[in-house]
């Protein structure tokens, strides 16, 4: 029948009538296309855009005529409603426009060289998308769907909530990752990019907009201009502009403009643009020209200059810092054994012993009457909300807890409204469970404000072995937050570490809940009201065109030159931005792109500042990867792709859009300027006749020995080099055993090698150096370092000459040694940003205002035996030539260690510049303190050389090498830090005292002039009175 019988559909028989609307929609005959005759000119061929597939011909779309658009009932931009698409796209099935696909590469804000101050400035969008549903946000947050229904003995899953029972890890690029160790920051804790962010505690505070203090730090109390207006597309807007001048590294003056653009969206555009990046024009830039370049979508005609009232800066502070709060409140519910409902927990009158033990660990029980610190809406005068409460502080935050058993109890009231009035309005609630309690279900709590529940169950309470387990339940529109729970949610010992973990979890939960739909809408309304008030009541009649310029024009009327090449703009301290597609792992090999599937790549915004490198997913606005620029080890690149190695050798792949080599060249130039990394080398190592590769490598991947006259030596492998990738896989992913097995058994070994530094030492990241410094033996109780009496290892000149070297002007550090950084032919030929030399040679080095003290004291410290990995000569047989080269290594060591003191030069120069106005005695006292600091540097640096024994036996030297060196690098670093900080504090204190003294002198002079004027006036009046009275006149003047 189906092959062509009477009832076959192929015979054209009409289908049976049906009431199904979807079936009718599918059976409608296709409308024939309209082809009217038009006489429109043929459109010019534009640039062809590559589609998602490389196959097939790509043609530019032909615009339809107005008549065709007028007679067509379908949108021309809407794709054809094919049956396949109708079944796969429910919106097309209902006749609705489909969702627009996301671009392959996320768009980047103009202007190109605007340096963003923080992460949320990278996410600023002139046309923000409407917020999606809670499920959409949750899908983007990377949380597994099955986690929403996971249950345990602590927590029951519920619709609309996401459960965290332990082992989820931190959300990163490509999925969950292990939590970072200090000094690295979690992704959610990264905020400010222009300034260094350090992790001083085990648990970091996340989801905090620390960039909100940008106006207070760089605008408030300084000369700047504010403009307010009502834009037709953006609504009320507020713009702040300020011109800055700072001394460049070459001695000239650099001008830049700090800009803040506020709209009704919660993300604010904050950053800096150099004057050299602006179009050529007069020597002074008008606010209109500046905003036309920085904010091209903002209508300049709607802006008016803000009033000079002191209310305006204060209101802008309140507007920007409404997301910053250092006073937090939370609720604590007490659940006895066998309880689980909301009414049962609210009706517990007295606290048990296990609950009191938990409260004592968490904070301090304070008397409310007369309490002067943060009270969290509790009555501190009449005890109407109870007599006591729980209060504590953590990381500069004041936290007041609303404890259910400490709030007033109302008999014969099952709901306990006096208690629920406080706890029900808290965003974060801690549910304490005694052993034997029922699992907590978040749907039993009826509240619109409670978004996060931290369930804590005690085990063996009131014993020396008390421990706790933790589970978390949050609403779907609340993003994930740390610290991450361990597998199974614990157990946690009852100590200070558990207290810090729980308080950090509570603070981060409240910050994360601010991104939920309800609180986001409330914050948006508040922000809109502030902006509306400023644009309506705090403006003058001065338009943007009539506003004064930032700089006074010179008499010569010299115009600003044409903007320099982008190489002069990559020096900005803020984050420059590129649109990339990122994936974990390395994919570029020997200049060829071997990218994997597209679904493994994530569209991201790449931001590189002078301190931090971040990848931000613009779809859900979270950081998926971050690392300090001092942790960048190396990079391998091709025309459109770049592999970045960081930390212990981990790698990520970045794919960039644009002209071949242009965007990649910009990123490489930026990395050369802000990091200590270099380009890698791809080596193919054949085996000799005996199947050997001809080199030795340790467990960390450092080359310890290369045999002479082997293929490894011929290809350029040297001791001190570092293996980053073996046969296409990174070393951290392989592990030492697998990498060794692959090196022994692979028929052809292809490796990615990181060359040693200029002094021949292995390159390590800052995180590795930090961990090595913690592992060094303590100096306390150890012998004092022995001074070398031979005179052959005098590495540095005396302290006076070192101080003179640090303070004198030097445009560039000493030249590199024999091992120079290698560059491929691709960068020389295709990089349009440099001609004849790399951008790192053209652009001056960024001044480091916060010197890396750890890197100053030791360039590349290593574990015992690391120096054995970089012998002074290739020959290890103890020949006379080898001993001769080693004994004459003093000048080489001097040349290698002197550049390491340059990172202190900016800090010492700043201190001396601040002390320039002091008296001669104070100045010499400062110099003596700096000299003592330099003596500490000399002591630590002089012990980095490896002395050779008098017998000249290299084996004896290696034996001495393996013994731990007396002294601790951490103590040297702490001593150096304390000296510098003390010196800076003393200088600041002296400056403050001098300013107060000058103010007192001015006051005395003013009073003296006033008294002198009054005495002259009295003498004049007395003289006039004596004349009128006829008395003999005397000259009283």
UniProtKB/Swiss-Prot annotation:
InterPro entries: PDZ, PDZ_sf, Rap/Ran-GAP_sf, Rap/Ran_GAP_dom, Rap1_Ran_GAP. Residues 316-534 form the Rap-GAP domain. The modification Phosphoserine is found at residues 65, 178, 299, 309, 812, 834, 907. The keyword Signal does not apply. Residues 952-962 have a biased composition (Basic and acidic residues). Preferentially expressed in both fetal and adult lymphohematopoietic tissues. Residues 682-758 form the PDZ domain. It comes from the Eukaryota. PROSITE patterns: PDZ (PS50106), RAPGAP (PS50085). The modification Phosphothreonine is found at residue 62. It is a peripheral membrane protein. Induction: By mitogens. Residues 968-1025 form a coiled coil. Residues 1-85, 830-849, 855-898, 943-969 are annotated as: Disordered. GTPase activator for the nuclear Ras-related regulatory proteins Rap1, Rsr1 and Ran in vitro, converting them to the putatively inactive GDP-bound state. Affects cell cycle progression. This is Signal-induced proliferation-associated protein 1. It comes from Mus musculus (Mouse). The lineage of its organism: Eukaryota, Metazoa, Chordata, Craniata, Vertebrata.
């Amino acid at each position: 029948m189906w092959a062509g019988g009477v009832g076959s559909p192929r015979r054209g028989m009409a289908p049976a009538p049906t009431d199904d609307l979807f079936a009718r929609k599918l059976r409608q005959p296709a409308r024939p296309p309209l082809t009217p005759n038009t006489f429109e000119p043929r459109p010019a061929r534009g640039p062809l855009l590559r589609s998602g597939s490389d196959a097939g011909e790509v043609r530019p779309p032909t615009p339809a005529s107005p008549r065709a658009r007028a007679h067509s009932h379908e949108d021309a931009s809407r794709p054809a409603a094919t049956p396949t698409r109708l079944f796969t796209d429910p919106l097309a099935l209902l006749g609705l426009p489909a969702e627009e696909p996301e671009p392959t590469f996320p768009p980047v804000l103009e202007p190109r060289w605007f340096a963003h101050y923080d992460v949320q400035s990278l996410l600023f969008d002139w046309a923000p998308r409407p917020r999606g549903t809670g499920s959409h946000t949750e899908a983007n947050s990377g949380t597994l769907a099955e986690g929403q229904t996971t249950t345990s003995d602590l927590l029951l899953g519920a619709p609309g909530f996401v459960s965290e029972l332990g082992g989820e890890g931190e959300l990163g690029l490509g999925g969950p990752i292990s939590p970072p160790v200090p000094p690295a920051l979690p992704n959610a804790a990264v905020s400010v990019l222009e300034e260094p962010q350090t992790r001083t505690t085990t648990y970091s505070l996340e989801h905090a907009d620390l960039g909100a203090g940008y106006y207070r730090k760089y605008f408030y109390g300084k000369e700047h201009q504010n403009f307010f207006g009502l834009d037709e597309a953006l609504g009320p807007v507020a713009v702040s502009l300020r011109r800055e001048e700072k001394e460049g590294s070459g001695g000239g003056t650099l001008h830049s403009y700090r800009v803040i653009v506020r709209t009704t969206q919660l993300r604010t555009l904050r950053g800096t643009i150099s004057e050299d990046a602006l179009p050529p024009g007069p020597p002074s830039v008008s606010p209109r020209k500046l905003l036309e370049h920085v904010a091209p979508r903002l209508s300049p005609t709607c802006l008016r200059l803000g009033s000079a009232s002191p209310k305006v800066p204060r209101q802008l502070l309140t507007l920007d810092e409404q997301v910053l709060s250092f006073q937090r409140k939370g609720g604590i519910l007490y659940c006895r054994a066998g309880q689980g409902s909301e009414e049962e927990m609210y009706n517990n009158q007295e606290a048990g012993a296990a609950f009191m033990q938990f409260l004592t660990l968490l904070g301090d029980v304070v008397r409310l009457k007369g309490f002067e610190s943060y009270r969290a809406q509790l009555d501190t005068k009449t005890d109407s909300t109870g007599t006591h409460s729980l209060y504590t502080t953590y990381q500069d935050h004041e936290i007041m807890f609303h404890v259910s058993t400490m709030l007033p109890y109302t008999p014969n009231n099952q709901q306990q409204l006096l208690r629920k009035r406080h706890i029900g309005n808290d965003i974060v609630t801690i549910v304490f469970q005694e052993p034997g309690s029922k699992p907590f279900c978040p749907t039993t709590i009826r509240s619109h404000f409670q978004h996060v529940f931290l369930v804590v169950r005690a085990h063996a309470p009131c014993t020396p072995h008390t421990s706790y387990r933790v589970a978390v339940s949050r609403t779907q529109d609340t993003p994930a937050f740390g610290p991450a729970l361990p597998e199974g949610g614990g157990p946690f010992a009852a100590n200070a570490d558990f207290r810090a973990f729980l308080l950090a979890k509570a603070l981060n939960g409240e910050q994360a809940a601010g991104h939920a739909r309800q609180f986001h809408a409330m914050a948006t309304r508040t922000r809109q009201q502030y902006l509306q008030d400023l644009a309506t009541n705090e403006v003058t009649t001065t338009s943007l065109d009539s506003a004064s310029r930032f700089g006074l024009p010179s008499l010569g009327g010299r115009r600003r030159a044409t903007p320099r090449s982008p190489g002069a703009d990559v020096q900005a301290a803020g984050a420059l931005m590129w649109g990339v597609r990122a994936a974990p792992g390395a994919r570029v090999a020997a200049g060829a792109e071997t990218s994997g599937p597209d679904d493994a790549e994530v569209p991201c915004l790449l931001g590189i500042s002078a301190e931090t490198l971040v990848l931000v997913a613009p779809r859900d606005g979270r950081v998926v990867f971050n690392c300090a620029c001092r942790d960048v080890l190396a990079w391998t690149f091709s025309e459109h792709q770049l592999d970045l190695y960081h930390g212990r050798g981990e790698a990520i792949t970045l794919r960039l859009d644009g002209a071949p080599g242009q965007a990649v060249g910009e990123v490489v130039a930026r990395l050369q300027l802000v990091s200590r990394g270099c380009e890698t080398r791809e080596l193919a190592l054949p085996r000799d006749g005996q199947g050997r590769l001809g080199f030795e490598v340790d467990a960390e991947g450092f080359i310890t020995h290369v045999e002479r006259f082997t293929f490894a030596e011929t290809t350029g492998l040297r001791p001190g080099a570092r293996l980053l990738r073996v046969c296409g896989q990174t070393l951290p992913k392989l592990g030492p055993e697998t990498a060794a097995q692959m090196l022994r058994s692979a028929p052809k070994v292809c490796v990615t090698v990181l060359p040693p530094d200029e002094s021949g030492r292995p390159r390590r990241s800052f995180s590795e150096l930090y961990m090595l410094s913690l592992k060094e033996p303590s100096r306390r109780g150890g012998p004092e370092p022995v001074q070398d009496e031979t005179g052959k290892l005098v590495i540095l000149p005396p302290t006076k000459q070192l101080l003179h070297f640090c303070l004198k002007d030097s445009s560039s550090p000493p030249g590199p040694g024999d091992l120079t950084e290698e560059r491929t032919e691709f960068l020389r030929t295709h990089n349009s940003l440099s001609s004849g030399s790399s951008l790192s040679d053209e652009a001056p080095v960024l001044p480091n205002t916060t010197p890396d003290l750890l890197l100053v004291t030791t360039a590349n410290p290593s574990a015992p035996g690391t120096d054995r990995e970089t012998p002074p000569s290739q020959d290890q047989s103890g020949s006379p030539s080898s001993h001769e080269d080693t004994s004459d290594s003093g000048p080489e060591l001097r040349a290698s260690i002197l550049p390491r003191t340059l990172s202190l030069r900016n800090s010492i120069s700043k201190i001396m510049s601040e002390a320039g106005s002091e008296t001669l005695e104070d100045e010499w006292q400062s110099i003596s303190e700096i000299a003592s600091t330099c003596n500490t540097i000399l002591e630590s640096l002089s012990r980095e050389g490896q002395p050779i024994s008098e017998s000249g036996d290299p084996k004896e030297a290696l034996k001495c090498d393996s013994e731990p060196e007396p002294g601790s690098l951490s103590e040297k670093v702490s001593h150096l830090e304390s000296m510098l900080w003390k010196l800076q504090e003393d200088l600041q204190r002296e400056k403050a005292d001098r300013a107060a003294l000058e103010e007192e002198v001015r006051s005395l002079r003013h009073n003296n002039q006033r008294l002198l004027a009054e005495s002259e006036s009295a003498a004049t009046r007395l003289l006039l009175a004596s004349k009128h009275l006829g008395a003999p006149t005397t000259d009283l003047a």
